[in-house]
Amino acid sequence: MKELRPVQVILLGFLITIFAGSILLALPIATQSGQATPYIDALFTATTSVCVTGLIVETTMTHWSIFGQAVIILLVQIGGLGVITITTGMFFMLRKRITLGNRMLIQESMGLNTMTGLVPLVKKILIGTGIIEGIGAVLYATQYVPEFGIGYGVWAAIFNSISAFCNAGMDIVRDDSLRSYVTNPVMNFTTMGLIILGGLGFVVWKDLWQGFKKIVKDKVPVKRMIQQWRFQTKIVLSITSFLILFGTILIFLFEYHNPATMESLSLPQKIQASLFQSVTTRTAGFETVAQAALTDASSLVSMFLMIIGGSPTGTAGGVKTVTLAILVFCVLSVAKQEESITLFKRRVPQNLLSKALAIIVINLIVLMTSVLLLLVFDHGTFMDSCYECVSALATVGLTKGLTPNLTIAGKVIIITTMYLGRVGPISMAIGFSQKNKKKMVMYPEQDLIL
């Protein structure tokens, strides 16, 4: 038997975690009624948890017992940080040596270009995650404990904090997500903060933390500190800020007079709700306004934001902010008749452009295929089916109401789409392809008419 490549181990790791979770969720103990959940629904729930999507066929609060909810949030944490990162954390706890093979797996799972400093980075990720989720849980508890009591209030706070940070979008306090809290600033800004921090990526975290220490300890000017950020951080923060602002403005304009969403809200509340919708579409899945009631214009903006998603090495899905930046600046370089792509006075390697194009094309193929199949087997409207499939592929979790009514075929389609969205269609293609030897022959170039 041939040794598995790192990418194959990662693909298999997610599959094993999903199937193990589905078996636990299919047990009678996992439901409040004590009756076993149909396996397809248990598999759907395990997949949406591990893939940190948030599309649900059974209401998390009322259907699942505390045991079932604990299984779900454990799967969310594993899926958000990655199977390999969690496994490495267990090695730390057991004081086991991290081998070269383990380091290669970590590098592949996080999409890093080097193995230098991997082990300290994983330690910082695990510690940072615990601190951020802990702070989030405390803030949620200030709202949940007065409403639900200490026991369930604390449990709901922990559950929602992990879910928000991992960009899963699942909660156990309402059957309408966070719509009851549309005017609550603590709930809104706590959730948005966790979503953004989870979606920025762990590499960006490192730069931000080091920059913060330089400002506080060494009194380094903010401008100089920003100049010292790595190339990746500058791109991620710039694109993330632009997309949040872009989405907020458009959704505010398109929903301002919509009686089913924001018309009854005050001006500050409309801005808050628009900001939340812009942030949550970046693969989180919580909602403070009903997605089915959005105008078509807002739905299109939301789908665009969903497709882009978060940033590399983070908990979010989508094609990623860096991919968008490379493609946008590629178009600008063509318009300016420049031979290379330049961002922040740095040239982007040609192989990254090829990879960015491949990511976009493969994701579009998967998306069109899943929409077509869903239209054939579930007969939903075109907009609802598109919204569902974009949400599944980008691991967002927002729906216009299609998920609970999916047929078995529809559930299989969405399960497959969520898995592909989490591991990445390119990773799947690489995992099933043969590893080719490096070609020693370079063929001559030939021009084409475009």
Predicted regions and their residues:
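Membrane-proximal intracellular helices of multi-pass ion channels
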Residues: M1-L450
